[in-house]
UniProtKB/Swiss-Prot annotation:
GO molecular function: DNA binding; DNA-directed RNA polymerase activity; protein dimerization activity
Subunit structure, as described in the record: Homodimer. The RNAP catalytic core consists of 2 alpha, 1 beta, 1 beta' and 1 omega subunit. When a sigma factor is associated with the core the holoenzyme is formed, which can initiate transcription.
Protein name: DNA-directed RNA polymerase subunit alpha
Reaction(s) catalysed by this chain's protein: RNA(n) + a ribonucleoside 5'-triphosphate = RNA(n+1) + diphosphate
Region (Alpha N-terminal domain (alpha-NTD)): 1-231
Entry superkingdom: Bacteria
Species name: Polaromonas sp. (strain JS666 / ATCC BAA-500)
Free-text comment about domains: The N-terminal domain is essential for RNAP assembly and basal transcription, whereas the C-terminal domain is involved in interaction with transcriptional regulators and with upstream promoter elements.
Gene3D superfamilies in the cross-refs: 5' to 3' exonuclease, C-terminal subdomain, DNA-directed RNA polymerase, insert domain, RNA polymerase, RBP11-like subunit
Gene name per UniProt: rpoA
Keywords: DNA-directed RNA polymerase, Nucleotidyltransferase, Transcription, Transferase
EC number: 2.7.7.6
Function noted in UniProt: DNA-dependent RNA polymerase catalyzes the transcription of DNA into RNA using the four ribonucleoside triphosphates as substrates.
Length: 329
């Protein structure tokens, strides 16, 4: 009797729009379409890393219920419009940006002054409309995070004390806007009781639908891997024989850490600890890296963010690493 479970052999990605795509995988054993589809959907909506405006200071404004002379919108509507700006930070956890403009007409996200490592995905998005003689001057703090974080959770934190004029925003960090899935029938030879999983994903443009699925799947793998490492390794008795000599690693793990484009300080700290490949890096824990001379919390956060953008985290386990023939320099 056949006891091996089928694994998907066909993966198809169909672009439905600029930020929408349909991802189809088949075949699955009966029931696995719903099992995996629901798990992926929940992770996509709740656990993806993204960036959002979290605080704003507007010249001449003391609180969100104010109005500004020469500006058509009140402050509440300005904040709502600001939440619609899609930011993408490269190799940093947070940044404070400036927006200054005067003269009649719309003020868009393209008017925000950004450094080279900050990207605005929707520069045409309107933030305010100025009347004759109007002007706007604001400072916008952008941070990375996961999911939805109400402003009340950070408003009176010890690290960022409440100050007059500082308006704390509710932040929706997730780059995934909508996810739905359906399970259809699939057939392999004479078997007609199989599943086909169809995921339809819409993002805000900061990530592609394919990258979002890839990152969410890796999060699930990392979480489920804990159950395969129960004390006593009792699950090993049920595993199929594995040829360790033919262990295949994700190609990204075999790339040098230089390709992560870390700051010079972070890169030198890693090399000093003989961490040359991404596969070496992800097996280190946060505590281990913090013990590295000259590598502080800021550098650690940079490393974590760069890894997260590739669907990786610190503290992962790799069997049979390093692979035979890998140059350890």
């Amino acid at each position: 009797m056949q006891t091996n479970l089928l694994k998907p052999k066909t993966i198809n990605v169909e672009q439905l729009g600029a930020n929408r795509a349909k991802v189809t995988l088949e075949p699955f054993e009966r029931g696995y379409g719903h099992t995996l589809g629901n798990a992926l959907r929940r992770v996509l909506l709740s656990s993806m890393v993204g960036h959002a405006a979290t605080e704003v200071t507007i010249a001449g404004v003391l609180h969100e219920y104010s109005s500004i002379d020469g500006v058509q919108e009140d402050v509440v509507n300005i904040l709502l419009n600001l939440k619609g700006v899609v930011f993408k930070l490269h190799n940093r956890d947070e940044v404070t940006l400036s927006l200054r403009k005067d003269g009649e007409g719309p003020v868009t996200a393209a008017d925000i002054q950004t450094p080279h490592d900050v990207e605005i995905i929707n520069p045409e998005h309107v933030i305010v409309n100025l009347s004759h003689g109007g002007k706007i001057d604001m400072q916008i703090k952008v941070e990375n995070g996961r999911g939805y974080v109400p402003g009340t959770m950070r408003r009176y934190g010890d690290e960022s004390p409440k100050s007059i004029g500082r308006i704390v925003l509710d932040a929706s960090f997730s780059p995934v806007k909508r996810v739905s899935y359906t399970v259809e029938s699939a057939r392999v030879e004479q078997r007609t009781d199989l599943d086909k999983l169809v995921l339809e994903i819409e993002t805000n443009g900061a990530v592609t639908a394919e990258d979002a699925v890839r990152a969410s799947a890796k999060i699930l793998v990392e979480q489920l891997a804990v159950f395969a490492q129960l004390e006593g390794n009792e699950l090993a008795a049920f595993d199929a024989p594995v040829q360790r000599s033919s262990q295949q690693f994700d190609p990204i793990l075999l790339r040098p850490v230089d390709e992560l484009e870390l700051t010079v300080r972070s890169a030198n700290c890693l090399k000093a600890e003989n961490i040359y490949y991404i596969g070496d890096l992800i097996q280190r824990t946060e505590n281990e890296l913090l013990k590295t001379p000259n590598l502080g919390r800021k550098s650690l956060n940079e490393i974590k963010e760069v890894l997260a953008s590739r669907g990786l985290t610190l503290g992962m386990r790799l069997e049979s690493w390093p692979p035979a023939g890998l140059d350890k320099r």
